[in-house]
A protein has these predicted regions:
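Acidic, low-complexity intrinsically disordered segments
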Residues: 2-26, 30, 54-95
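Beta-strand elements of well-folded, non-transmembrane domains
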Residues: 31-39, 44-52, 75-77
Length: 95
């Protein structure tokens, strides 16, 4: 059985990863969370490319792209790990 990753899960993963980036140019770590009865974990090492954006509140360094060096996305239910069809490039569209 394979768990189909829905747009809502990609969005949730992107939000949690963006929060974990913490303004740096490189991220290596994991984000874990529950979603729809599944325990999810993204473990990744990524290079963070940023661009300067001028906003009325001031300038910010927004994420322009993430270049994955290595990543794994795990989903598990009460019976153990469940294979999934996660795509890092699809998740990036939600950043």
């Amino acid at each position: 059985m394979s768990y189909s990753v829905l747009p809502e899960l990609y969005r949730e993963t992107a939000v949690r990863l963006a929060d974990a980036l913490d303004g740096g140019g490189y991220f290596s770590g994991s984000v874990r969370f529950a979603f729809g009865g599944m325990e999810c974990r993204l473990t990744a090492s990524v290079i963070v490319c940023r661009r300067r954006e001028s906003l009325p509140e001031g300038d910010v360094d927004a994420v322009a792209d993430l270049v994955p060096v290595w990543w794994e996305f795990h989903t598990a239910d009460g019976e153990g790990e469940v294979a999934n069809d996660f795509s890092f490039s699809e998740m990036k569209a939600y950043l």
